[in-house]
């Protein structure tokens, strides 16, 4: 799924602690720019994933502006479902990418974001019954709890994710709904992760 990073200039949208920035450099990237809105995360990224080829910038990805053809690879890990205007950002991303450039991203799966609560339904004994999927075709704002705090996310259908790329001239190269690997099935709760997808991975080319 990952592209060849050798001598590439990379933009990481929603870079968090900079793990993917470091990965890009490890794989031979010439330069990596990590962008995130969280000052705390960027401070930590500077501590644990600092490198002469990595720079960090604090900004909302929707507010970013770069010249056309600035990057060979643009990636985003579990951040785009926090963006309200996905089509406008995709249009920018295509402009920022060089010809044949790669756009690679992961988001929470639309099945996972549809209902909003992002939690299982349990019986009176606390046993899992099922995972709720409701209001799937009603796109827009959802309130969820993440690490004990209420956060706002934006639900989109799978069709919207794919067609937004296609309408903006991207070529879809790969789409993956990752399942837990077999060697993790003995871990507590892991078998339940086979009951619904949690993430969606997409790779497209300009």
Q: PLM features: what roles do these ranges have?
A:
Residues 72-87:
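A short SAM/SAH-binding and catalytic strip from SAM-dependent methyltransferases
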Residues 152-175:
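Short alpha-helix
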Residues 87-102:
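A short glycine-rich, Lys/Arg-flanked "PGG" loop and its adjoining helix->strand segment in the class I
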Residues 102-140:
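Conserved class I S-adenosyl-L-methionine
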Residues 107, 111-120, 145-160:
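Acceptor-substrate binding/catalytic loop of class I
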């Amino acid at each position: 799924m990952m592209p060849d990073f050798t001598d590439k200039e990379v933009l990481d949208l929603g870079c968090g602690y900079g793990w993917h920035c470091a990965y890009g450099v490890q794989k031979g990237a010439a330069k990596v720019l990590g962008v995130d809105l969280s000052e705390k995360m960027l401070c930590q990224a500077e501590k644990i994933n600092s490198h002469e080829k990595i720079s960090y910038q604090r900004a909302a990805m929707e507010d970013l502006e770069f010249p056309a053809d600035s990057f060979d690879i643009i990636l985003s890990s579990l951040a785009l479902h926090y963006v309200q205007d996905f089509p406008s950002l995709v249009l920018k991303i295509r402009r920022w990418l060089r010809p044949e450039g790669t756009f690679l991203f992961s988001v929470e799966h639309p099945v996972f974001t549809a209902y909003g609560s992002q939690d299982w339904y349990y019986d009176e004994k606390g046993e899992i019954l099922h995972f709720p999927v409701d209001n799937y075709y009603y796109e827009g704002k959802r309130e969820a709890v993440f690490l004990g705090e209420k956060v706002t996310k934006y639900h989109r259908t799978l069709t919207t994710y794919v067609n937004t790329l296609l309408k903006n001239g991207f070529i879809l190269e790969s789409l993956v709904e990752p399942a837990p690997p077999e060697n993790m099935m003995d871990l507590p709760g892991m078998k339940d992760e086979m009951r619904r997808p949690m993430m969606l991975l997409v790779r497209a080319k300009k």
